[in-house]
Amino acid sequence: MKVTAMLNPHLLDVAYNYLLLMDMDCVVQSVQWKQLSTDTYCFEPFYDSQIKWLYAPKSGQSFDSYLENYATLIRVKQVQQHRKELILHCVDFLTMKANDNFMVFKNYINMIIKVYLQFYNYRFPINFEDNTMKPCVNLTFRRGGSWKTQLQPVCNYVYKSKNMPKFIK
């Protein structure tokens, strides 16, 4: 869903300057409002500081990364400015052979890396500690596996419409 919005400028014909797309288990902790308005990155990824590497091998071809796809901040005007160049990244997703979480994650990470290098001449470092990019929205999240077909009890998120949302002040 996040990638669809990121790569489809028609979906971004909205009356907002910023869109924060995030998983249900994310909680906004704080917003650096000045940084939000002055940074010019079309997409702002989020980080998992527990993962120390840009590509941390797991098993087989799978990997973890300090770059995370649980949330993405989209600066609508900047995406519109780069819409022609972003079409090329859309092709990577349209030609993707597998339809599983790992391949979507891999292509998302690769797209973020390519966009930052191409548009902003920024190369994400191999080691998280060397990363100088700081997000303007600080989030917490619960790493779980909510994307799996069989959920573990700890990750079994149940939405109860009678429970009002709680916002941190």
Swiss-Prot record:
Family matches, as InterPro entries: AcMNPV_Orf112
Classification via Pfam families: DUF2661
Protein name (record): Uncharacterized 20.3 kDa protein in HE65-PK2 intergenic region
Organism this protein belongs to: Autographa californica nuclear polyhedrosis virus
